[in-house]
Swiss-Prot record:
GO terms assigned for molecular function: serine-type endopeptidase inhibitor activity
Cysteines joined through disulfide linkages: 31-81, 40-64, 56-77
Family indicated by similarity: Belongs to the venom Kunitz-type family.
Protein name as it appears in the record: Kunitz-type serine protease inhibitor microlepidin-1
Tissue and organ distribution: Expressed by the venom gland.
Superkingdom assignment: Eukaryota
Family annotation (PANTHER family): KUNITZ-TYPE PROTEASE INHIBITOR-RELATED (PTHR10083), SERINE PEPTIDASE INHIBITOR, KUNITZ TYPE, 3 (PTHR10083:SF376)
Compartments reported by the entry: Secreted
Organism name: Oxyuranus microlepidotus
Keywords carried by this UniProt record: Disulfide bond, Protease inhibitor, Secreted, Serine protease inhibitor, Signal
Keyword Signal: yes
Function recorded in the entry: Serine protease inhibitor.
Main location: secreted
Signal sequence, renumbered to the chain: 1-24
Length: 83
């Protein structure tokens, strides 16, 4: 392959990398956990990242236990998990 062809290939690969969305491999593992209200029943509006829908959704957190996929604001959820 000529040097011009290699340069074109390198440019196309670079463009592909820039335009490809961040994959789930780049997200923290906690973003893959399901929403977990926990056993308590206080009822705090919270947000979790839904990997199937690829967005942060609201749920009601009971106030104790649960898991790490639990954010006070949608913005915090998006900055941690959304690509």
């Amino acid at each position: 392959m000529s040097s011009g062809g290699l340069l074109l290939l390198l440019g196309l690969l670079t463009l592909w990398e820039v335009l490809t969305p961040v994959s789930s491999k780049d997200r923290p593992d906690l973003c893959e956990l399901p929403a977990d209200t926990g056993p308590c029943r206080v009822g705090f509006p919270s947000f979790y990242y839904n990997p199937d829908e690829k967005k942060c959704l609201e749920f009601i957190y009971g106030g104790c236990e649960g898991n790490a996929n639990n954010f006070i604001t949608k913005e915090e959820c998006e900055s941690t998990c959304a690509a």
